[in-house]
Amino acid sequence: MRIMGLDVGSKTVGVAISDPLGFTAQGLEIIKIDEEKAEFGFTRLEELVKQYQVEQFVIGLPKNMNNTNSPRVDASITYGNHIEHLFGLPVHYQDERLTTVEAERMLIEQADISRGKRKKVIDKLAAQLILQNYLNRNF
């Protein structure tokens, strides 16, 4: 069963996919979106869903450190509701506190990637971490 992980931001959506057995997550790509123009990347997402035969989604919830909802939580849930409606597939949510910080740390310490290059891959890596955390917790 393939699960797609998403890190939803206001300008990009990081995308990750699980292996067929649901053990590991791999970053796929970053989809550019524009909330103000109501462009949410659903066409590209549909292509990926078909290509990887996705059966469910995991979307990161950007909670605050004190476990309250950040302003982006509502946007992530709204995005999840759209996906559930468009694809008819279940959507789960995963606390994503510190995943972007962890992703940035990994890119600096392990890959020694410059700031400019980090911006191009950080959302994809964050989506991978969100999905891997979900897989570790549920499978």
Swiss-Prot record:
- Localized where? Cytoplasm
Gene Ontology, cellular component aspect: cytosol
Enzyme Commission number(s): 3.1.-.-
Q: What is its main location?
A: cytoplasm
Keywords tagged on the record = Cytoplasm, Hydrolase, Nuclease, Ribosome biogenesis
* Any one GO biological process: rRNA 5'-end processing
The cross-references to Pfam families, in alphabetical order and at most eight, read: RuvX
* Name of the protein this chain belongs to: Putative pre-16S rRNA nuclease
Species of origin: Streptococcus pyogenes serotype M2 (strain MGAS10270)
